[in-house]
Amino acid sequence: MFDPKKFVEEAIEELRREIGDRKAIIAVSGGVDSTTAAVLTHRAIGSHLVCVFVDHGFMRKGEPERIRELLEEELGLNLRFVEAAEEFFEALRGVTDPEEKRKIIGEKFIEVFERIAEEEEAEVLVQGTIAPDIIESERGIKSHHNVGGLPEKLNLDVVEPLRDLYKDEVREVARYLGIPDEIVERMPFPGPGLAVRVLGEVTPEKVEIVREANAIVEEEVEKAVEEGKMSKPWQAFAALLDCKATGVKGDERDYGWVIAVRIVESIDAMIADVPEVPWEVLRNIQDRITSEVPEVTRVLFDITPKPPATIEFE
């Protein structure tokens, strides 16, 4: 049986051995993986850790501001906030292949971190990589920005304190470390963010559409859970398909984007199933998206489990 107390004690000792008196940086997204890795490392080396939050332009609605508040004020981490949206959008210009997008985002992340690391005179990069990330990357299912995107000649030593843990174990460790429930229970969110929920080329306009649609999905699912209409899913989100469809708004023909809604249940992200979501919930999601996001004319519901599909679309 997994013992979070024992894991934390051993991980802190190992981090101290691996990092020593060197300065380290870690990418924090506000998710449970990176936050747990950050708090764990902070316990081990204190002020020698610099937490770097990169706003790549692909975060959920209102997320950068809230994450900054949680990490700085509530957890007391030493945080550097980097605005880099223009860099990421430019790097992804014209790119449509999902693997290429993930690789580019990973490389850009490392490029930004190396720049910050040089300014901070850091020698170690701590990552919140967990077991499913490594397994999917090794099997060639999909690259993860904190696994497959690493350049061969990385100028920093890489430390991954959570690499042997699955998501449910990470949450146990997070609770033991006193991390707020808002982070512990936060739905998993991919490192590349909304960029992998935009099929085809990633543009600021497309990201804004999926950001608004995604917020609606999360709000409606959270409301349904609170009202006892459904159990809390592993993930619930919106993806923007790389196609348009004809619609009718008012008395006029419209030609707009198609949103796919994805709701899944899982324990460790290795396999996932699709729950029977109440029809009322799906209708509410559709009504709000097509009325509040004018660029969208059609909303679909994805019923494919993992396998054969992956949880994210890209």
Curated annotation (Swiss-Prot):
Summary of the function given for this chain in its UniProt record: Catalyzes the synthesis of GMP from XMP.
A single GO molecular function term of this UniProt record: CCA tRNA nucleotidyltransferase activity
Name of protein: GMP synthase [glutamine-hydrolyzing] subunit B
EC numbers on record: 6.3.5.2
Catalytic reaction annotation: XMP + L-glutamine + ATP + H2O = GMP + L-glutamate + AMP + diphosphate + 2 H(+)
Pathway participation: Purine metabolism; GMP biosynthesis; GMP from XMP (L-Gln route): step 1/1
A GO cellular component annotation in the UniProt record: cytosol
GMPS ATP-PPase domain residues: 2-186
Residues reported to bind ATP: 29-35
Spans through the membrane: none
Alphabetic keyword roster: ATP-binding, GMP biosynthesis, Ligase, Nucleotide-binding, Purine biosynthesis
NCBIfam families: guaA_Cterm, PRK00074.1
ATP-binding is among the record's keywords: yes
Record note on quaternary structure: Heterodimer composed of a glutamine amidotransferase subunit (A) and a GMP-binding subunit (B).
Pfam families in the cross-refs: GMP_synt_C, ThiI
PROSITE patterns per UniProt: GMPS_ATP_PPASE
CDD domains noted in UniProt: GMP_synthase_C (cd01997)
